């Protein structure tokens, strides 16, 4: 059902709980029987590059955290350097709290 809502630009809200990862997966509309959680990216350096390349090469749903002041730079880097503009994206903010923000980007 979440996938149909996503495809039709209908936003659904999770019941806030203990896990931001599970809450985001419950509303994203992506196939989530297989997913990987990558945590936070390193701020800079080789470790960041390695993790970004891992996310890009992952074929299933990928979940990661990013700081609000770095999210635009990270998304830009993923789009420009790694050419992931063809992948759907959902950005969730404050997903386990009352004021939830969900942004959906569909590549098609």
Where are the language model's segments positioned?
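A contiguous loop/helix-start segment that scaffolds small-molecule binding in enzyme catalytic cores
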Residues: 60-61, 65-108
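Glycine-rich, phosphate-binding/catalytic loops in enzymes
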Residues: 1-2, 81
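Class I SAM-dependent methyltransferase SAM-binding "motif I" and its flanking Rossmann-like core
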Residues: 2-58
């Amino acid at each position: 059902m979440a996938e149909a809502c996503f495809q039709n630009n209908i936003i659904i809200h999770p019941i806030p709980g203990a896990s931001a990862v599970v809450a985001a997966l419950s509303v994203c509309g992506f196939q989530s029987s297989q997913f990987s959680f990558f945590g936070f990216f390193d701020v800079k350096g080789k470790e960041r590059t390695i993790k970004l390349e891992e996310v890009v090469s992952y074929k299933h749903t990928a979940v990661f955290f990013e700081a609000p002041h770095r999210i635009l730079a990270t998304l830009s880097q993923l789009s420009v350097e790694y050419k992931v503009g063809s992948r759907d994206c959902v950005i969730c903010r404050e997903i386990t709290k009352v004021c939830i923000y969900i942004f959906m980007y569909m590549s098609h």
